[in-house]
């Protein structure tokens, strides 16, 4: 990431707002907008956040679930710890069965909300990056089949591409 990207980031109003309001990322506001409109996360819910680092979505989820809910965040990268007793961070690859088993253990096999803001490591080759993004999304759908409660909520952010209508279920 070059200095141009750094300058653009620091001039971004949501980046500035996140820093001012002590959110871990500007992505927090996208989830807040979605939740305001669709009432995705409720007090007491169990929430799984795949691709959680740096923790912006998990942070919003923790605010919404209160003390009775649980939030499990999973990412390949380190997630700076939250000092909340109902947050569990897992550093690992959610596409791997061993990590999925740990998530199932922590949630007792059920989640009311499954959300993913995961993105692949970018190569710079648009079509390849898109295919890798779709693979992650398909993995999230498979995990949802196993863990998401009936009437649960699934939120996935992914790269936009013309082939989504052909590839996704």
Regions found by a protein language model. Give the residues of each.
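Class I SAM-dependent methyltransferase Rossmann-like catalytic core
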Residues: 2-43
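Conserved SAM-binding loop of SAM-dependent methyltransferases across substrates and taxa
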Residues: 54-66
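Class I S-adenosylmethionine-dependent transferase superfamily signal
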Residues: 61, 103, 140-144
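Mobile active-site "lid"/loop adjacent to the S-adenosyl-L-methionine
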Residues: 91-94, 109-155, 162-165
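Glycine-rich helix-loop-beta junction characteristic of Rossmann-like nucleotide cofactor-binding loops
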Residues: 36-42, 107-108, 146-147
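Conserved class I S-adenosyl-L-methionine
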Residues: 43-53
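Glycine-centered, small-residue-biased loops immediately flanking beta-strands
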Residues: 45, 69, 152
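S-adenosyl-L-methionine
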Residues: 74-121
